[in-house]
């Protein structure tokens, strides 16, 4: 009997890299989307941290009055922010090599574009990575679908809204007080509180919080005890066990009697699908509202729409909201606008009807 020994061909470096990238047994799954996700998110995070501490003031309004947002320039954690790119740049792509110098790039708010664009690309790849990992494990794709909600919300305020308004200077600043400033100005300019898509989004977020609290409390209140009275109920379960840990029939019966029968689910799959669907669809609606208002399809305006038989205005909540909007409009960008257009919308009064005669 003759035995033939052949040298096993070693896999190429590329083949080993492909195997390692797509291996399910890694402590952290990388995947092909992760190849793009990791460097983009690391870049966005690194530039964000550096800019938070040391970025120089940015001429956000394009009127040569720079606004400081970093900690080294007198801000704290609450007031600090990454200031959006200058209105002088508009929606032009503004990488470092487009500026004459690094100082000019910083003065015009280049770090904001760098952070936002890398961040959005990174989180989109995170969606793809979730789908890829689920596919390789034989799971269904709903985890990646659910994560589209925060991604489209971020895309709406960081990308779609600036494009619709014509400048990255209208994007949301990357900071706590900057976020609140963005919300107030958005309300003043677009009346978002009266936009039906935003109202659906509020119902989705608050409803999702309510349903999550209700579900969690019902589950923890109807655990199937596997231990004695002298031992914690938490000790009777194993991670990944096949047996149910709580009695859904008991939870369904309790909640059905607490409200009414059809207000509760008796099917675990439909229950959890609803819990995932409600907030995700709500955030989708909110993102759509911001995206439509980016192109000035604003919220409803019912100002002075209720009058009595004499034609006198009966002030409603819409009129109060309008006055608040005007106040916020006056306060923001006070150096860029001498007189808000909203307050100058009435008919102009003639100051001189006839030119004076000059007798020389």
Curated annotation (Swiss-Prot):
User: GO annotations under biological process?
Assistant: photosynthetic electron transport in photosystem II; response to herbicide
Instruction: Cite the EC number.
Output: 1.10.3.9
Q: Which UniProt keywords apply?
A: Calcium, Chlorophyll, Chloroplast, Chromophore, Electron transport, Herbicide resistance, Iron, Magnesium, Manganese, Membrane, Metal-binding, Oxidoreductase, Photosynthesis, Photosystem II, Plastid, Thylakoid, Transmembrane, Transmembrane helix, Transport
- Residues bound to chlorophyll a PD1 are 198
- Presence of keyword Calcium: yes
Residues at site: Cleavage? 344-345
Read off the Gene3D superfamilies from this record. Answer: Photosystem II protein D1-like
Which parts of the sequence bind chlorophyll a ChlzD1? 118
Q: Where is this site: Stabilizes free radical intermediate?
A: 190
Q: Summarize the protein's role.
A: Photosystem II (PSII) is a light-driven water:plastoquinone oxidoreductase that uses light energy to abstract electrons from H(2)O, generating O(2) and a proton gradient subsequently used for ATP formation. It consists of a core antenna complex that captures photons, and an electron transfer chain that converts photonic excitation into a charge separation. The D1/D2 (PsbA/PsbD) reaction center heterodimer binds P680, the primary electron donor of PSII as well as several subsequent electron acceptors.
Name of the protein described by the UniProt record: Photosystem II protein D1
Say which species the protein is native to. Antithamnion sp. (Red alga)
């Amino acid at each position: 009997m003759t035995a033939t020994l052949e040298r096993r061909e070693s896999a190429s470096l590329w083949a080993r890299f492909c195997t390692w990238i797509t291996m399910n047994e890694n402590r952290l799954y990388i995947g092909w989307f992760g190849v793009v996700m990791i460097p983009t998110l690391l870049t966005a995070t690194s530039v964000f941290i550096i800019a938070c501490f040391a970025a120089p003031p940015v001429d956000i309004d394009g009127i040569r009055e720079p606004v400081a947002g970093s900690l080294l320039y007198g801000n704290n954690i609450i007031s600090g922010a990454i200031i959006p790119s200058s209105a002088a740049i508009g929606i032009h792509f503004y990488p470092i090599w487009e500026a004459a110098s690094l100082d000019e790039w910083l003065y015009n708010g280049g770090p904001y574009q760098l952070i936002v664009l890398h961040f959005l690309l990174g989180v989109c790849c995170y969606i793809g990575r979730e789908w890829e990992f689920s596919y390789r494990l034989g799971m269904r794709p709903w985890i990646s679908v659910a994560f589209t909600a925060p991604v489209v919300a971020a895309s709406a305020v960081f990308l779609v809204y600036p494009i619709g308004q014509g400048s990255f200077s209208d994007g949301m600043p990357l900071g706590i007080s900057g976020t609140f400033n963005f919300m107030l100005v958005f309300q003043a300019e677009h009346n978002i509180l009266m936009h039906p898509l935003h109202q659906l989004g509020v119902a989705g977020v608050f409803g999702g919080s309510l349903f999550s609290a209700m579900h969690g409390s019902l589950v923890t209140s109807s655990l199937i005890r596997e231990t004695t009275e002298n031992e914690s109920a938490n000790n009777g379960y194993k991670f990944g066990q096949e047996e149910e840990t709580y009695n859904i029939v008991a939870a369904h019966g309790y909640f059905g009697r607490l409200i009414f029968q059809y207000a509760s689910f008796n099917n675990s799959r439909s229950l959890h699908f609803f819990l995932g669907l409600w907030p995700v669809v709500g955030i989708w609606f909110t993102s759509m509202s911001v995206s439509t208002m980016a192109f000035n399809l604003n919220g409803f305006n019912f100002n002075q729409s209720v009058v009595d038989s004499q034609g006198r205005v009966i002030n409603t909540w819409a009129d109060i909201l309008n006055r608040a909007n005007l106040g916020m409009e006056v306060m923001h960008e006070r150096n860029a606008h001498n007189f808000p257009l909203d307050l100058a919308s009435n008919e102009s009064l003639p100051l001189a009807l006839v030119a004076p005669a000059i007798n020389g």
